[in-house]
């Protein structure tokens, strides 16, 4: 089986935004500190990357990690609401830091997970900090979340946003359900909600006849 070289690479997408899978951190946990990354948006369940992230946090204790537990599956609704499913992790040294982190965690309750991702990315970028967005391979889940950020932030269509990312990381390829959900957002903008995402996932689960 061929191993694409980009799987072991952290790709720089903008001045502050980086994209990858977990492999670069497994190979070298110090790479996060070397790239001056202060925020990590992990678009997968924490259990799959806990060892790699623990090593990162030991080397870079100022880093904040947000976990959006997405599955790379056509049944995954990117707009599903957070019902105590996300994790927000940071080594806090003072009660003030802890309270700030807890306030942020509470603010994310009952919000669409992709919107939480947008907020987390935007906060990092607006504060001038570097952020890594990753999933297992840096191909589908993390790419979809980043593409949504670009679409919303710059009011651009899906095709333009995904091309921008693909020009900087050639292996990107969101699954078909994620593509349709993002294209649905393109059509409806902020009116695209969790039930719209469910229509897309139901299409793949049941077929078009069940959507009528």
From Swiss-Prot:
Catalytic residues (positions) = 135 (phosphocysteine intermediate)
Instruction: State the UniProt keywords alphabetically.
Output: Hydrolase, Protein phosphatase
Q: Which InterPro entries match?
A: Dual-sp_phosphatase_cat-dom, Prot-tyrosine_phosphatase-like, Tyr_Pase_dom, TYR_PHOSPHATASE_DUAL_dom
Q: Which GO terms describe its biological process?
A: negative regulation of MAPK cascade
SMART domains registered for this protein in UniProt: DSPc
Which intervals of the chain form a coiled coil? Answer: none
Gene Ontology terms, MF aspect: MAP kinase tyrosine phosphatase activity; MAP kinase tyrosine/serine/threonine phosphatase activity; protein tyrosine/threonine phosphatase activity
Superkingdom, natural source: Viruses
Identify which top EC class this enzyme belongs to.
Answer: hydrolase
Please report which protein family the annotation says this sequence is part of. Answer: Belongs to the protein-tyrosine phosphatase family. Non-receptor class dual specificity subfamily.
**Name of this chain's protein:** Putative tyrosine-protein phosphatase R622
Species of origin reads: Acanthamoeba polyphaga mimivirus (APMV)
């Amino acid at each position: 089986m061929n191993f694409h070289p980009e799987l072991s690479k952290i790709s720089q997408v903008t001045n502050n935004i980086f994209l990858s899978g977990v492999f670069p951190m497994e190979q070298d946990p110090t790479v996060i500190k070397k790239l001056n990354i202060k925020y990590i948006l992990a678009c997968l369940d924490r259990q799959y990357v806990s060892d790699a992230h623990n090593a990162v946090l030991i080397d870079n204790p100022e880093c904040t990690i947000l976990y959006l537990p997405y599955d790379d599956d056509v049944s995954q609704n990117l707009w599903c609401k957070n019902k105590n499913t996300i994790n927000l992790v940071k080594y806090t040294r003072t009660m003030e830091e802890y309270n700030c982190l807890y306030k942020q965690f509470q603010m994310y309750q009952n919000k669409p997970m992709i919107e939480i991702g947008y907020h987390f990315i935007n906060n990092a970028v607006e504060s001038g900090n570097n952020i890594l967005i990753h999933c297992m391979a840096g191909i589908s889940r993390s790419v979809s979340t980043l593409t949504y950020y670009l679409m919303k932030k710059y009011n651009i269509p899906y095709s333009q946003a995904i091309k921008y990312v693909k020009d900087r990381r050639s292996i990107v390829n969101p699954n078909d359900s994620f593509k349709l959900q993002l294209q649905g957002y393109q059509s409806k903008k902020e009116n695209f909600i969790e039930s719209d995402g469910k229509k897309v996932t139901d299409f793949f689960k049941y077929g078009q006849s069940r959507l009528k």
